[in-house]
Design a protein with these regions (language model features):
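Active-site/ligand-binding surface loops and adjacent short beta/alpha elements
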Residues: 1-69
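Active-site pocket scaffolds in enzymes
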Residues: 59-151
Length: 151
């Protein structure tokens, strides 16, 4: 959960297990996209990145998109999603990131920032992939192939 931008998940615990957040006494399944008229706004982090990928699927159309990245560089990812809840936009943005939360001072205080020394550089790659006939993602291979979950 992004403390500075809690949105409509404001009643949820700071930390929760994907995909369910408990908000004001009821469970919110974050895999489900609410209608725009519900005016929902989410901003939260995935902090246990192991294999270096994140993905979104449209289960109705079978279209999936995902990002493959180096988990040593991008140790977490975040999802900002507004379904009419911010400026009436209907969009989801999934992105790997090097640290969290959004506020740098809080990130640094928690020891979650990446630091480059003067003159130091960092080079990495991020692979964006789109694939049809996928309703749930098991993984993303290094060549960008999105693997359908078995379940």
């Amino acid at each position: 959960m992004e403390p500075a931008f809690r949105g409509t998940l404001g009643g949820a615990a700071q930390s929760f297990d994907w995909p369910t957040a408990r908000v004001d006494g009821h469970n919110v399944d974050l895999r489900q996209i609410p209608s725009v008229d519900q005016r929902q706004l989410y901003f939260f982090y995935g902090t246990e990145v192991k294999d270096g990928w994140c993905a979104l699927t449209n289960t109705a159309t079978g279209l999936a998109c995902g990002l493959k990245f180096d988990p040593a560089v991008f140790r977490c990812n975040w999802l900002f999603a507004t379904y009419g809840g911010w400026r009436n936009y209907n969009v989801a943005v999934l992105e790997p990131c090097t640290g969290y939360p959004l506020n740098f001072e809080a990130m640094r205080a928690a020891g979650r920032q990446r630091t480059l020394a003067p003159g130091e550089s960092l080079k990495t790659e991020i692979l964006f992939s789109v694939q049809e006939a996928i309703t749930s993602v098991e993984s993303i291979r290094s060549d960008g192939t999105i693997v359908q979950s078995r379940s």
